[in-house]
Design a protein with these regions (language model features):
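Hydrophobic anchor at the beta1->P-loop junction of P-loop NTPases
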Residues: 86-88
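Canonical P-loop GTPase G-domain recognition
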Residues: 3-33, 219, 223-296
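ATP-binding Walker
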Residues: 91-94, 946
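Extreme N-terminal, non-catalytic leader segments
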Residues: 21-84
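Conserved Switch II/interswitch segment of TRAFAC-class P-loop GTPases
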Residues: 176-179, 185-189, 198-216, 225-240
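Nucleotide-state-sensitive switch-loop elements of NTP-binding domains
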Residues: 61-83, 94, 99, 103-191, ...
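Flexible, glycine-rich loop/tail regions that form catalytic "lids" or insertion modules at the edges
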Residues: 38, 292-506, 786, 790-797, ...
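Catalytic alpha/beta active-site cores
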Residues: 1, 399-700, 705-706, 724, ...
Length: 966
């Protein structure tokens, strides 16, 4: 139907089977290879300022559609227009597009959007293919305004840096009534200065990494450019680069009557929001352009003193850049220590046994006591304690009940369950080692569940009253999702709710009649725009009940959504007080209700901005600002004693869904976790004040490594936290949620998906995950239906309640292959830590796109093997059904027109009700961000009067937008 309406081609799973990924790409490119005939506007029509006419004219000029006489008329008309032109060029990867965007932002801010600005971004054409990647637009955040026009062009010739018809294109833009034209040219070599004749003022952008100072003699643009920017000024050697370039410009201009520091050379960090180096550069360019006739306006930006960026913020201090390599070394040191201690324990036992046998045989014992004493003294305190207490541990686990005495209270936990055949199945099985060396190694590397290094699990026993099942829902408006959550949890005493949000909410926008927003409202997730929506979403659930926990899958605008949730919980408990007492609480009582709510509320918010940059795409604010607010959330949690709610769910799930293999998923996720630890420590927090608020979220899958993913994660985390960071036992416990693989769900033979999900759920439960979400079989093509969700939940229930071996809670321990896999995966993760460390840690690796590139490579490897059949997937590339699958009408979960309209009306009602308080709340929020105060503390107030979209727009102004990469 869509193809009949003009969509060229939709590719189906069947196309993927027959064509493969490369085949679909080739088909798409072939269909776009021949340009359609476009309308050629008249030259004089350009003076109307119509942007559509301008874009068509530029295309016509590129395609030589105008006659020589028409082009001559264009030149004559444009000659009467004195629009100044700024040319920006520089080396490839210097940050020209980011610099251009920040300069445009300064023009907009300084002129209060009174200038009409055109941007012409030129990218090089490749000699071999004749194609060009027009990728500059994706880096632009400041162009979304009626007064900004941007057009990307290819050079259409691999041997030049500017298009053949650049002069005519600039003439066409001049006629369209712009006040300023900015031309950005491709990255160039040392001998190119082709842009200079076409512009009035030229800016050359470079980085500090140009080699020896003598290389500067070879750069033509240092002769011809008017202004110079050394971008990425936060890198090592920047000050030296500034000195060398300034001296070179001084020599080139023979300006020996002036000092090098007066040359127009600026140190900038275009990637940093509101960088004062960029502002200084802009103010220099503004002066140059005014000399060439730039429209006058009253500048509002304060003059910047100096020429370089001074607001350098290091999230991870330079002295801690090797943290991942140090963690890898700490884990390996622990293994070496374990090997040494187990050897000593074995030899001590062997010597003691030898002594006993010799004594029984009446032989001499000379020297044995000394050898035994030497090994005994070499055993550390922990090893001795573990061996000494082992008999008592065996006795504790051998009875029918495990008894713990806390003060005067006894807590009894059943240790056996009788099967139908009368067999007593142990809840925790212990090794039968007689050798002290093997026993000590097991205690130091495995141990019973709930004991360091927590390889088998972070808790002694699973809760009898609460399965690790999460009830996942999100569709339509808050009322519909609330109804679904109640349906899912009606048979469970524990309400473990998980919420998905629609893409409008995920990107921090409000519902809007604008078609591209309106169509997404309430689809593939619930629409939440205000505190009213959040209250309706969880209405009827006691958010402070110990058996209720809420997980929210949201990242970019997570701070705002979290503030809404906490306010909803406080409002709920306040209403309970009113209902119980028949009156509103006094101010002191209200403060007590708030404090108690924050202490009791239980759940997690995803809020992992590092994973979003590496594997997904819902980053909306600058990375620096997002990390700052994440730290603010944790500081707020620490200050208010929020101990049962996780401030972040450090997520590998989306990294895996993007294509990473299980080792990369685990390594990247743990590395991100340790990065948060380092960032919070750098803010002055104490590790034991925040580590318990960190949780993890992993994918499961069919690969063998997934069987040990949790054990490896727990062991690495606990060892690093104990020995590298000196954390206490609670901080050493890594708690994680598992969601079965979405990538393993296939549209072909969908009913087989439940089989895959069952196997993945089984290994997750065997590995003692702390909570589990099983995907529905139809999620390959739609949001799950009530029927498919019920089947998905039944998978967990059948394993937990019917599967016999699930009675045992450490069934992975003692398996040779599990032990081998654990060691192999652990070492692979440590090696990945070292590779990331070589790139400057997680943040340094993100700058070069290391994680994203590796994920893409691994995804392609999977797709190729799936297509060629070397990776068998039943029902997809093997065991194919000879009979075509029967056609059936699948229920698609979609929001209704009534729900969309209701959301718009509720949003308007909220805004009208809070119109008199909104401006003040947003201004306080802005001030908190500008003054480096705790933004989340102010956000807790702002969400009471402001919508999600209003807060997002405010954060864009004070924190900057995320700048996307290709």
């Amino acid at each position: 139907e869509l193809q009949n309406h003009g969509v060229a081609r939709l590719y189906s799973p069947a196309d993927g089977q027959s064509l493969g990924l490369q085949g679909m790409i080739d088909d798409m490119l072939q269909r776009t290879r021949d340009a359609k005939c476009a309308f050629k506007p008249q030259i004089d029509a350009l003076t109307s300022g119509d942007r559509i006419q301008l874009t068509r004219s530029i295309s016509s000029i590129e395609n030589n559609a105008y006659s020589d006489s028409e082009l001559n008329d264009l030149r004559l008309l444009a000659a009467k227009v004195g629009t100044p032109i700024l040319g920006i060029t520089g080396t490839g990867g210097a940050g020209k597009s980011s610099s251009t965007d920040e300069i445009v932002r300064r023009f907009r801010q300084d002129s209060l959007d009174s200038l009409n600005i055109a941007i012409l971004a030129i990218d090089p054409t490749r000699k071999k293919t004749g194609g060009a990647l027009l990728g500059d637009r994706i880096r632009m955040n400041a162009i979304n305004h009626d007064r900004i026009f941007m057009r990307s062009l290819a050079t259409r010739n691999a041997s030049v840096e500017i298009p053949q018809r650049l002069a005519e294109i600039l003439d066409a833009i001049k006629l369209s009534g712009f006040d300023l034209i900015i031309v950005e040219t491709p990255g160039i070599g040392q001998g190119d200065a082709g842009i200079v004749p076409f512009v009035d003022t030229s800016l050359y952008v470079m980085t500090p990494e140009f080699g020896a100072a003598s290389q500067l003699e070879k750069i033509d643009m240092l002769d011809y450019a008017d202004v110079f920017a050394i971008n990425k000024f936060d890198r090592k050697g920047s000050e030296d680069a500034l000195r060398d370039v300034s001296k070179q410009v001084q020599r080139n201009r023979s300006a020996f009557d002036r000092t090098p520091d007066t040359m127009p050379v600026y140190g900038t960090i275009a990637s940093k929001f509101n960088d004062n180096g960029i502002t200084a550069l802009y103010q220099c360019l503004l002066g140059e352009l005014r000399q060439h006739g730039l429209k006058q306006f009253d500048s509002i930006l304060l003059a910047v003193e100096g020429r370089v960026s001074t607001q350098r913020t290091l999230i991870i201090p330079e002295s801690r850049q090797r943290y991942l390599a140090e963690i890898a070394e700490s884990v390996r040191d622990y293994h070496r220590q374990v090997s040494e201690q187990s050897r000593l324990a074995r030899e001590r036992q062997q010597l003691a046994a030898s002594k006993s046998m010799l004594k029984q045989a009446g032989k001499t014992l000379d020297g044995l006591d000394e050898l035994i004493a030497k090994r005994d003294s070499s055993l550390d305190h922990l090893a001795k304690r573990l061996l000494d207490t082992w008999p008592q541990i065996k006795e504790d686990y051998s009875g029918q009940e495990f008894v713990v005495r806390i003060r005067d209270k006894e807590i009894r936990t059943p240790l056996k369950k009788e099967s139908l055949s009368g067999t007593a199945i142990s809840r925790v099985s212990l090794p039968q080692y007689e050798d002290h060396g093997e026993l000590l190694k097991w205690l130091l590397l495995e141990n019973v569940p709930g004991k360091f290094p927590f390889t088998a699990g972070v808790f002694q026993f699973k809760r009898d009253s609460e399965d690790p099942t999460r009830m996942f829902a999100g569709e339509g408006d808050a009322f519909r999702t609330n109804k679904r959550l109640k349906q899912l949890s009606e048979h469970s005493e524990a309400k473990r709710l998980s919420t998905a949000f629609d893409s409008v909410t995920l990107y921090g926008f409000d519902p809007d009649p604008q078609p591209d927003i309106y169509g997404k409202v309430g689809n593939s997730g619930v629409s939440i725009a205000t505190l009213d929506d959040m209250k309706a979403l969880y209405d009827g659930f006691d958010l402070c009940d110990p058996s209720t926990s809420v997980s929210m899958t949201i990242n970019g605008p997570a701070p705002t959504i979290l503030a809404m949730f906490l306010n909803a919980a406080i409002s709920q408990q306040t209403q309970k007080f009113i209902d119980a007492n028949g009156q509103d609480p006094a101010e002191e009582q209200l403060a007590d209700i708030k404090a108690e709510t924050l202490r009791q509320v239980r759940g997690t918010v995803q809020a992992d901005i590092l994973k979003e940059d590496q594997g997904q795409n819902t980053c909306i604010f600058s990375t620096e600002f997002s990390l700052k607010v994440m730290g603010d959330i944790q500081a707020y949690f620490t200050q208010h004693g929020v101990r049962n709610f996780y401030s972040v769910s450090i997520s590998g799930y989306h990294i895996a869904e993007a294509g990473a293999n299980p080792i990369s998923q685990l390594a990247f996720t743990l590395a991100n976790g340790f990065t948060f630890v380092e960032a919070y420590l750098a803010r002055g927090m104490q590790v034991d004040n925040f580590a318990h608020n960190l949780s993890f979220f992993f994918s499961n899958g069919m690969d063998p490594e997934y069987t040990v993913l949790g054990r490896v994660a727990r062991r690495i985390w606990s060892v690093a936290m104990r020995f590298r960071y000196g954390a206490n036992e609670r901080s050493q416990k890594l708690k994680y949620h598992i969601q079965t693989s979405g990538r393993s769900l296939h549209a072909q033979e969908m009913s087989f998906n439940d089989i895959r999900t069952t196997l993945q759920a089984l290994i997750a439960i065997y590995d003692n995950c702390n909570s589990l979400h099983t995907n529905a079989y139809d999620e390959a093509i739609t949001t799950p239906t009530e029927e498919s969700v019920r089947r998905a939940m039944a998978i967990q229930l059948i394993i937990n309640k019917e599967w016999g071996l699930a009675v045992n809670e450490n069934s992975n321990q003692g398996s040779f292959i599990i032990d081998e896999l654990t060691d192999l995966v652990e070492e692979a993760v440590l090696k990945e830590f070292e590779r990331i460390s070589e790139r400057g840690g997680v943040l340094g690796a993100m700058e070069t796109g290391y994680q994203r590139g590796k994920i893409q490579d691994e995804s392609m490897h999977y797709e190729h093997r799936k297509h060629d059949g070397s990776l068998p997937i039943v029902g997809v590339n093997t065991f194919l059904n000879d009979e075509p699958e029967p056609e059936f009408d699948l229920e698609l979960a979609r929001s209704t027109e009534a729900e969309k309209q209701s959301q718009l009306q509720r949003l308007q009602s909220f805004k009208q009700r809070n119109a008199d308080k909104k401006s003040e709340a947003l201004e306080r929020l802005s001030e908190a961000a500008r003054n480096d105060e705790n933004v989340f503390a102010e956000l807790m107030n702002a969400v009471q009067h402001c919508s999600l979209g209003e807060i997002t727009d405010t954060f864009f102004e004070v924190g900057g937008q995320y700048r996307r990469n290709m």
